[in-house]
């Protein structure tokens, strides 16, 4: 006797797909960037690939799938040809994707007929990558969109088989631009195609007027820094509630459930200690050996856990950058949380972070990094940092691709200095490929372009709220362009 009878499976399928019985699923009207990107690929029949939405928990991936179902229905797609599966459901975790599909075809929609598969939390299905490969290769009538919140270490044959078969659409936390939209706030009156790099050609009066356009969103930027880019917390004005949601539904769920179920982690206490250690030292250079000693474990254990946290979309890793042909002798990485609000929630830091210069600097640096990573994603860049051991000069973030090198330094203080002795200028003097460099500041009065004698690179001091907003807006424009002209990177 089978553990699950067909009627047990069918009951779950009907529960997840209300449109089969002429009911509707309640979905919010706000569409994230990932919805627009994935829907373009879903409806383009010339692209024979699946779409994979990848990002942290609670950023709206499930909502995007239900919004896609709603869009399909509005276009006249037969309701029973749309199948949504939440693969972390207790019943569906007992099945392979093939078994769920078999019941769907036997009872709901015939095999061979066109269908749309919306697969949520696909990492919970055994060998999901091989199942998707087979479906994409041998079932051309199926259009597939999947989501995942954690990236398992894949076998070499699995990685090879995935190449060219699905398009990865990143789904990080909300950008500041999206944060304003989801809160239905008025957006600054600025050109939709304005990018940060365009500001190097603008006059000081233009920049002064631009800064004035952003005055009305300063309080929203502070709220964004405090509660982060998660849709549920963005819509709440209760800070304590927001932080509890982040601790319980994002951090604890990943550390105590996903890490056990997906990665087989047994010593959860060690992993939790490491995560708190990273919260306390966010943005600092991490010595694995020192960290292991302080936490009472081995360097190998710490290295393994760091990789898992990165795979679970909880941290960003920045490696040290080479410059001037000099190799980095001590390969020590920097780690940031993927959203500054996670740190606030875990360490119980409330509105006081907005008035503490040291705390606020870490929060701003994390937010700037999130926007840089998302904006440059399509170029598959290397995101690094630079520090010169002899002089202790440093640059917080360097984005590198074959076409550009962009150094970014965060100095969120009242009187940020920028001269030839500053780490940002020293780095630009060593790397002739740099054309533009940014210093992210606090005050509008600092907004402007600076030239330093003897350097070809130009420098832009730009307030953090303006920089992050323009990066988020430009990210939307890039994905719209990608949908028309080229595909994003493939896994």
Residue locations for each model-derived region?
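A short, basic N-terminal segment
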Residues: 1-47, 488-491
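Interdomain motor-coupling "hinge/lid" segment immediately C-terminal to the ATP-binding subdomain
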Residues: 2, 9, 149, 157-271, ...
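Accessory nucleic acid-recognition modules appended to NTPase machines
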Residues: 2-5, 81, 234-404
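Hydrophobic anchor at the beta1->P-loop junction of P-loop NTPases
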Residues: 53
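Conserved lysine of the Walker
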Residues: 61
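Hydrophobic positions on the alpha1 helix immediately C-terminal to the Walker A/P-loop
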Residues: 64
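Short glycine-rich substrate-engagement loop in P-loop NTPases that contacts/grips substrate
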Residues: 83-112
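Domain-level recognition of nuclease-like catalytic cores that cleave nucleotide substrates
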Residues: 203, 444-491
């Amino acid at each position: 006797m089978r553990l699950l009878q067909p009627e047990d499976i069918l009951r779950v399928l009907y529960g997840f797909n209300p449109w089969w019985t002429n009911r509707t699923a309640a979905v919010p009207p706000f569409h994230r960037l990932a919805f627009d990107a994935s829907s373009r690929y879903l409806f383009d029949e010339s692209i024979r690939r699946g779409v994979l939405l990848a990002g942290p928990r609670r950023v709206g991936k499930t909502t995007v799938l239900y919004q896609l179902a709603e869009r399909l229905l509005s276009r006249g797609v037969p309701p029973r040809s749309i199948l949504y599966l939440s693969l972390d459901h207790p019943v569906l975790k007992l099945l392979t994707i093939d078994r769920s599909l078999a019941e769907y075809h036997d009872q709901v929609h015939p095999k061979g007929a066109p269908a749309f598969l919306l697969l949520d939390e696909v990492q919970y299905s055994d060998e999901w990558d091989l199942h998707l490969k087979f479906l994409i290769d041998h079932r051309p009538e199926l259009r597939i969109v999947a989501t995942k919140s954690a990236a398992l270490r894949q076998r070499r044959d699995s990685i090879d088989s995935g190449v060219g078969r699905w398009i990865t659409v990143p789904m990080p936390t909300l950008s500041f631009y999206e944060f304003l939209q989801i809160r239905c706030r008025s957006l600054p009156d600025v050109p939709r195609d304005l990018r940060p790099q365009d500001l190097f050609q603008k006059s000081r009066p233009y920049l002064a007027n631009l800064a004035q356009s952003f005055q009305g969103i300063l309080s929203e930027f502070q709220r964004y820094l405090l509660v982060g880019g998660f849709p549920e917390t963005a819509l709440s004005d209760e800070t304590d509630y927001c932080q509890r949601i982040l601790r319980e539904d994002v951090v604890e769920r990943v550390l105590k459930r996903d890490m056990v179920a997906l990665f087989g982690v047994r010593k959860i206490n060690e992993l939790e200690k490491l995560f708190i250690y990273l919260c306390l030292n966010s943005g600092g250079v991490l010595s694995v050996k020192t960290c292991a000693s302080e936490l009472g474990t081995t360097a190998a254990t710490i290295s393994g856990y760091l990789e898992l946290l990165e795979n679970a979309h909880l941290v960003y890793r920045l490696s040290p950058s080479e410059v001037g042909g000099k190799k980095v002798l001590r390969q020590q990485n920097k780690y940031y949380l993927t959203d500054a609000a996670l740190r606030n929630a875990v360490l119980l830091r409330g509105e006081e972070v907005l008035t503490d210069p040291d705390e606020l600097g870490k929060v701003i640096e994390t937010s700037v990094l999130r926007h840089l990573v998302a904006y440059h994603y399509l170029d598959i860049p290397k995101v690094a940092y630079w520090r010169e051991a002899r002089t202790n000069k440093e640059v917080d973030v360097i984005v590198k691709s074959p076409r550009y090198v962009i150094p970014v330094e965060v100095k969120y203080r009242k009187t940020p200095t920028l001269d030839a002795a500053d780490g940002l200028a020293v780095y630009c003097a060593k790397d002739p490929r740099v054309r533009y460099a940014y210093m992210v500041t606090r005050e509008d009065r600092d907004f402007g372009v600076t030239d330093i004698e003897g350097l070809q690179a130009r420098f832009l001091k730009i307030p953090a709220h303006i920089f992050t907003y323009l990066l988020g807006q430009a990210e939307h424009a890039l994905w719209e362009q990608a949908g028309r002209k080229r595909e994003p990177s493939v896994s």
